């Protein structure tokens, strides 16, 4: 495994750990999710280019489409929560609270 793959895997791991540790604000969770999607995109693209998988060449584009949809939904949820509650805490998203 080359150093580039190790660095991208470490970026994914750091983003995952950031998602697990900084769960209080919705914006930090969204940024960590975007970091994970970006590292997955780069790793998938490099694997396809290095192994000459011509049939799977559309997979990174599809991943980018899903990442854009996830970002749009996340930002709309952030705007809705900020307008409703005044903060972007994740604990405000609990539907069981009165």
From Swiss-Prot:
Q: Which family does it belong to?
A: Belongs to the complex I subunit 4L family.
Does the record's keyword annotation contain Electron transport? yes
Any Gene Ontology CC annotation? respiratory chain complex I
Has keyword Transmembrane? yes
Task: Please provide the record's keywords in A-Z order.
Answer: Electron transport, Membrane, Mitochondrion, Mitochondrion inner membrane, NAD, Respiratory chain, Translocase, Transmembrane, Transmembrane helix, Transport, Ubiquinone
Q: Which organism is it from?
A: Lynx canadensis
The record lists the lineage as: Eukaryota, Metazoa, Chordata, Craniata, Vertebrata
User: Top enzyme class of this protein?
Assistant: translocase
Q: What is this protein called?
A: NADH-ubiquinone oxidoreductase chain 4L
